[in-house]
Amino acid sequence: IQSIVQVAKNFGGVEHRIEFVREIDGVKWYNDSIATSPTRVIAGLNSFNQKLIVIAGGYDKKIPFEPLAEPVNKNVKILILLGATADKIEKAVTESPLYPESGLKIVRVKTLEEAVLTAQKMAEKGDVVTLSPACTSFDLYPNFEARGRHFKRLVNEL
């Protein structure tokens, strides 16, 4: 039992799955690049007990984004969108009856670099920023691991 307790204390989690990257000026940054579908993003959003800043978007694998509408409107304060699916995600979220009262801000960017810098500028002490794409990375990266590593490098260079 002692060894199980030790493993639990020292387990750092799985890379790219709600992986803590670092804290900068009171803002915590997480890499959830493996969240390549709305259901995985929703699971990630439910892991936090506050409204988040979320970076999302990527390759369009022709899946519906309507399941994101309610959880995003309830759990996200700033949604930073990029990639081929930005229009579809924004449409799904803004067509929700929850959107007008949610206070959600939506920002469009062209690159992950721009997304990270935008999140840094908009974040306040106590905020959480997470890369939770809801999409595969094939429009910009060979796989979710490459996207996640790039995100971590960008955050660590801030």
Please identify what each model-predicted range represents.
Residues 1-76:
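Nucleotide phosphate-binding/pyrophosphate-handling subdomain across enzymes
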Residues 32-33, 57-58, 82, 107, ...:
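Glycine- and other small-residue-rich loops at beta-strand/loop junctions that grip anionic moieties
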Residues 68-126:
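C-terminal helical cap/extension that packs against the catalytic core
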Residues 88, 135-139:
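Short glycine-rich, flexible loops that bind phosphorylated cofactors or substrates
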Residues 121, 150-158:
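Phosphate-binding loop of NTP-binding sites
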Residues 130-134:
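Short beta-strands and strand-loop turn motifs
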Residues 141-144:
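Short, solvent-exposed loop/turn segments at secondary-structure boundaries
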